[in-house]
Each structure stands twice: as C-alpha cells, then as structure tokens.
C-alpha cells in the first residue's frame, strides 16, 4: 500500500494526534512522515473550505509534500516547526496549525521557485540580438504545423510508431508505447484518461458505419466528467483494436492506484502509472521532432492536442476539445447554464461519422455525407461475415489473467478481429484489395510507405512474460 493510500484511511483528528506524538517524543524526528502528515492535514482543511468539497488528488499531495519535506525543520527547544509552503500568504496557515496542533508553534515561509538568472539573461540576450532559435517554443504553433494536412498528421504518427519499433528493446515496452500513442490520438484523450479506463467495463457496441466496436468506461478524469475510450476498426497499422490485442498479450491486469482520498470505484486500470513518465523520457531522448524538444511540452499527452487540431482542420472542431472529452451539441431544450453545470452527468457518445472518418474506410462527399472511400470494401459487410470464435478456453490461454477481468464476449470479438486483420496485412493481394483507395485517409498504411515490399507481419516469442499462449498455438 502506498503512503498516500495509507494516509487517506487515517481520520483527520487521528492524523493530528500522530503529529503530536512525533513532536513530543524527541530525536530522532521522522521528518518524512511528519511532512506527509502535515501536508495531508493542510490539504484536508483547504479542500473542505470549498463550496463543493473537492477530493485530495495524489498529484496535488505529491507536489505540496515535496516542498514541505525539503524545508522541514523542528526546533525542540522552542517547540517550533519550520517549513515552506506554496501559498502567497501563510499567516492564516500558521495560525490554523497552531490552533489545531497546540501547544506547538509553526513558522511557515512562502515557497518560491528559484529563478535561473543566467538562463533568463541568455534568453533575453538572444531575443534582443535577433538570434531566433530554429526550434519554436510555441507548442500551439508546432501542433498546428503537424496537423496542417492529412499527410502531415498521419506521417507524424507513422514516424513516431517507427521510432518506437526501432528504439525499444523490450517487447512489453514496445507494445505499451504503441498502445499509448495510438489510443490517446485516436480518442483525443489525456494519457491519464486512457490509464484510468476500467478494463472490467469493456463492451461491444454497434456502430452504424463500422459494425461492432469496443469501448471501456473511464470513471476518473481530470475534469471529473466521465467518458469512454473507444476501440474501432481502422485501415492498416494504426488500428486501436490491433493495438489492444497486442497490449493484452504482454501486459496483465494492473491494480488500480488510489489517486484521490475518496474510495476507488474499481479494482483495475488499463496502464501502469510509471508508463507515462517512461514514455515521456523515451520520446524526449530519442525523437528528433520539434514538438518533443520543447521543454515541458506535451509528450504522452500530445495525442489529444494533435487530434483536436486535426479534426478542426477537417471541419470537425465541435467533435473534440482540448480537454480530452468528446464534445456534442448541447441538448435541445436545455439552458446553457444547465448544460454546463449538471447536464455533463448524462453520458454522451461521439457521433458515428467521426469513427467513420478516423477509420479511413470512409470519406466526406461534396454533399457533406460520409461515404465509402472504396466501394470494393465495406466494413459493415465484413463485420457481418466475421466468424467470431466461441472457444473460451483459447481466450483464457491467450490473454491469461486479463480474461478474468475483461468480459469474455469482448475478448472473443477482439481475438477474432485481430487474427483476421493480421491475415489481411500479411497477404499482399488482400492488402491491395483493402487499401487501394486513390486518396487513402492513412497515406502511410501501404507496404511501400514502410520502405520495404515485405508484407507487414507480427510474431511473438514462444514464451511470453505473462505465461500466455503464442499466436502460433491457436
């Protein structure tokens, strides 16, 4: 159990009592534990003062605790606790702590982030001297360049996928990075939204343009607005369903991390917490893309920004927002205030034509309707003839412990789709039939664009780290 999970289970007055016990027993003072308790007590009071009592988030606790721990000092002779806290005015905080944790005194200084004078002067010097860096520090400008055209957008995704293939050593890391890249982009979502998806909620839903697709529910989001993550058929490499199948082969169920002081609503999450940090470091080090070289620029979270900009450039701006939740027209007959204040509790789904557009199987006609990009292939007809396996034992062997968490019907569909799709990608004749559009939505999905005429294939080692069966055993 993490320290945060332990602390949220301790009642506030019991936290105060533990602080008093620590201060009264003398040297050695466990400063790290004291810093954690003080931070939790302060955040509990601050959050409870809001009109709607807000939960204490793990990220908030970690940020404030770090500053407290670095500066914490206890003077036993005067019974005074010294530390820094991120507030403009700490007078009320000092008085509150002395009232709640009597008879001890508190001196709380304002924490200020140190300024790198040399860096600031150098930056101003370069600007005034007329030296412009080749790399733009404007994140928005770089994203606009990437999403300017269909080719520029999908070529960027292609290059990043190729980088992951070439620069990752461990298969587990490779499939996880590919999964993160594709799903945050294709769902216009924050990386944390993808991470917090509940795998036990996977379900098959019917889509008017594509047939059956999968979705998973996300109870926890940064905006506190629940949403879904969607997995739908797409042309070629960038396929959320294929990415999900590969990911579940290598990564078992991930226990849910407690991220707020409220009780967790579910037992498992989709991604490891450390994956986002690992991905950020990998991309910053290995990629030569300008967007990834901007200090503090988006990396794991780039997908939602890029997709929002891409949709905006294709007259679909209302379908996505930079906040990572799909947006729809406000409901008819509902006031603007009601829609913004409480109608978000009604679960909304993106329009089907959005999936059709992103799948690459459809294009927008001059009349504004979405029609098949090529008449030879209709994903609806293909879905109707897809031979869904009923072999649950095979599914249990293939997906291992994931089969105990994810509903069986979702895995049966996923397995069947993935196997058939890989056969198509491995068969040049079938691939040419499927991807012979004059203007494909995903220009990099032809064999020629990979720099080789070798058909795209996927193989797994004979023994997987999760003890699952290999594709050749089916």
From Swiss-Prot:
Entry-linked SUPFAM superfamilies: DNA breaking-rejoining enzymes
Residue ranges of the region described as Disordered: 426-474
GO molecular function: DNA binding
UniProtKB keywords: DNA integration, DNA recombination, Plasmid
PROSITE patterns according to UniProt: TYR_RECOMBINASE_FLP
InterPro entries assigned to the protein according to its UniProt record, in alphabetical order: DNA_brk_join_enz, Integrase-like_cat_sf, Recombinase_Flp_C, Recombinase_Flp_N
Record protein name field: Recombinase Flp protein
Origin species: Zygosaccharomyces bailii
Lineage, top ranks: Eukaryota, Fungi, Dikarya, Ascomycota, Saccharomycotina
């Amino acid at each position: 159990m993490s320290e945060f999970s332990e602390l949220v289970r301790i009642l506030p007055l019991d936290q105060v009592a533990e602080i008093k016990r620590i201060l009264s027993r003398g040297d050695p003072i466990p400063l790290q534990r004291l810093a954690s308790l003080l931070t939790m007590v302060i955040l509990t009071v601050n959050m409870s003062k809001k009109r709607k009592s807000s939960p204490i988030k793990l990220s908030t606790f970690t940020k404030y605790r770090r500053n407290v721990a670095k500066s914490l000092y206890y003077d036993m002779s005067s019974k005074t606790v010294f530390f820094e806290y991120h507030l403009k005015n700490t007078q009320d905080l000092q008085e509150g702590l002395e009232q709640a944790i009597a008879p001890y005194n508190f001196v709380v200084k304002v924490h200020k982030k140190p300024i790198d004078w040399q860096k600031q002067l150098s930056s101003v010097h370069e600007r005034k001297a007329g030296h412009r860096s080749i790399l733009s520090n404007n994140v928005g400008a770089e994203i606009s360049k990437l999403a300017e055209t269909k080719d520029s957008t999908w070529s960027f995704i292609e290059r990043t996928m190729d980088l992951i293939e070439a620069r990752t050593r461990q298969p587990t890391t490779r499939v996880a990075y590919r999964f993160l890249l594709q799903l945050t982009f294709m769902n216009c979502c924050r990386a944390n939204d993808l991470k917090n998806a509940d795998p036990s909620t996977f379900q098959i839903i019917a889509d008017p343009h594509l047939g059956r697709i999968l979705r998973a529910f996300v109870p926890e989001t940064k905006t506190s607005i629940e949403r879904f993550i969607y997995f739908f058929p797409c042309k070629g490499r960038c396929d959320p369903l294929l990415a999900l199948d590969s990911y579940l082969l290598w990564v078992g169920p991930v226990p849910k991390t407690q991220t707020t002081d409220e009780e967790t609503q579910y037992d498992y999450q989709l991604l490891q917490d450390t994956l986002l940090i690992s991905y950020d470091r990998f991309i910053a080090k290995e990629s030569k893309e300008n967007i990834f070289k901007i200090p503090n620029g988006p990396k794991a979270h780039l997908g939602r920004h890029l997709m929002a900009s891409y949709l905006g450039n294709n007259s679909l701006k209302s379908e996505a927002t930079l906040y990572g939740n799909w947006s729809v027209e406000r409901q008819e007959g509902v006031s603007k205030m009601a829609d913004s204040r409480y109608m978000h509790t009604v679960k909304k789904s993106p329009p089907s034509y959005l999936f059709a557009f992103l799948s690459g199987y459809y294009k927008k006609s001059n009349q504004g309707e979405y029609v098949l990009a090529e008449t030879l292939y209709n994903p609806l007809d293909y879905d109707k003839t897809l031979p869904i396996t009923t072999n649950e034992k095979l599914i249990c062997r293939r997906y291992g412990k994931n089969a105990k968490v994810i509903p069986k019907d979702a895995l049966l569909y996923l397995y069947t789709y993935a196997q058939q799709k890989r056969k198509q990608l491995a068969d040049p004749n079938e691939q040419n039939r499927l991807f012979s559009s004059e203007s494909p939505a995903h220009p990099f999905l032809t064999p020629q664009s990979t720099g080789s005429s070798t058909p795209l294939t996927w193989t797994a080692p004979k023994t997987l780290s999760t003890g699952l069966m290999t594709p050749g055993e089916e």
